[in-house]
């Protein structure tokens, strides 16, 4: 089967804000990375995960820096996650908000899995990137992973009455030449490299303290919209897979329906 990994176009909201801070021309950057500007105008459009990773690297390279991912996270907007973002903002507590992103993560992207491991004192959110079937390479780049984790921490800081910070962050790559030294400043906690997993841990009590903006009625209506959105995504995924399969087989001649079915 030909996989298609994508992210919600809402990610372009904080990316554009970050580009404005870094004095980078948004439209030119999108064009250079093969992203259509029309995707920015459609809140339900999907963008190739690979293209977005290239866009992040493009901005770092242009300014000869390494921390564009953190600037993106600092510019978090609920619309980044579509309806899910607003449902998370109206959650009873941070634990409920994180459980929603565990459940509806596909709205944000289909590039990884998210699992919350709950303990009496510590909760851990584990992110596992999917792999490209043909190369076994992780779909998410290191900077894409940083954006996702840092965005969740920024969200928690926006919603919580606490000066929220994780207890620790674990990353599965090396900090060669202190390239990622800036992460400690943002997360304000221990950042461990060369680990067997990608995760961050939080105090369970803090995660379960009520949020001032909690509203069950709002979250119920938003979850209905999210379920409908997921249904549309599933249909679109099938269409995209068929298109990719046809494209892959064209060099071998016009594929038959049977050929395509075998690839799905």
Predicted features along the sequence, with ranges:
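Surface-exposed, interaction-prone regions with an acidic/low-complexity signature
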Residues: 2-17, 132-134, 141, 145, ...
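Short, well-ordered alpha-helical segments
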Residues: 13, 95, 142-150, 216, ...
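N-terminal low-complexity or simple alpha-helical regulatory segments
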Residues: 1-126
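N-terminal regulatory/effector-sensing and dimerization cores
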Residues: 82-204
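Extended mid-to-C-terminal alpha-helical interaction segments
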Residues: 185-264
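Surface-exposed helix-capping loop/turn segments at secondary-structure junctions
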Residues: 25, 160-164, 252
């Amino acid at each position: 089967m030909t996989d298609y990994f994508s992210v919600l176009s809402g990610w372009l909201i904080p990316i554009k804000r970050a580009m404005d801070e870094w004095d980078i021309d948004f439209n030119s950057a999108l064009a250079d990375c093969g992203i259509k500007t029309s995707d920015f105008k459609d809140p339900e459009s999907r963008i190739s995960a690979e293209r977005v990773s290239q866009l992040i690297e493009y901005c770092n390279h242009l300014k000869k820096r390494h921390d564009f991912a953190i600037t993106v996270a600092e510019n978090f907007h609920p619309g980044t996650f579509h309806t899910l973002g607003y449902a998370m903002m109206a959650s009873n507590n941070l634990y409920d908000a994180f459980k929603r992103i565990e459940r509806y993560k596909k709205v944000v992207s289909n590039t990884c899995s998210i699992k919350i491991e709950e303990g009496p004192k510590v909760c851990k959110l584990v992110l596992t990137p999917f792999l490209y079937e043909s190369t076994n390479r992780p779909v998410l780049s290191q900077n894409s992973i940083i954006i996702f984790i840092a965005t969740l921490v920024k969200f928690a800081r926006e919603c919580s009455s606490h000066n929220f910070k994780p207890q620790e962050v674990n990353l599965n790559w090396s900090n060669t030449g202190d390239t990622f030294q800036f992460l400690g400043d943002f997360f304000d906690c221990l950042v461990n490299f060369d680990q067997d997993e990608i995760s961050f841990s939080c105090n369970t009590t803090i995660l379960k303290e009520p949020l001032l903006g909690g509203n069950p009625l709002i979250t119920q209506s938003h979850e209905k919209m999210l379920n409908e959105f997921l249904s549309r995504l599933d249909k679109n995924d099938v269409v995209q897979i068929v298109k990719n399969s046809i494209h892959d087989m064209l060099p071998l001649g016009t594929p038959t329906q049977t050929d395509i079915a075998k690839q799905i």
